[in-house]
Amino acid sequence: TVRKRIQQLESEGVIKGYSAHIDYQRSGYPLRMMLFCTASIPERGDLVSDILAIDGVVSVQELVTGEQNLLVTAVGESDSDITPVAQELLDMGLTIADEVLVRSHEATPFGEFKTD
């Protein structure tokens, strides 16, 4: 059954938890900005929790290829909400190589998990 399969994936650590799928546009935070950053490689992993603690940051991804090795996503009501995020990243010693304004974001779960 589906329930047993989910329980199996949870016990194997494949499913680590559940989160809400938030429509930031409808919640009053229409601006979504991706900031491509560079951190020193020894510090990169240690910085993730500090970056997530910055007000407005909703995700951090470690990148393993290219010069930019952290992708920070922040949301806000306006540009003035994103500027403090960028400043805090700079204060942490990160370099911001690029900023990208996101118009929309859609996702789907990976559908290739095999059943026994």
Where are these regions (language model features)?
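A compositional/biophysical signature of low hydrophobicity enriched in polar/charged and small residues
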Residues: 1-116
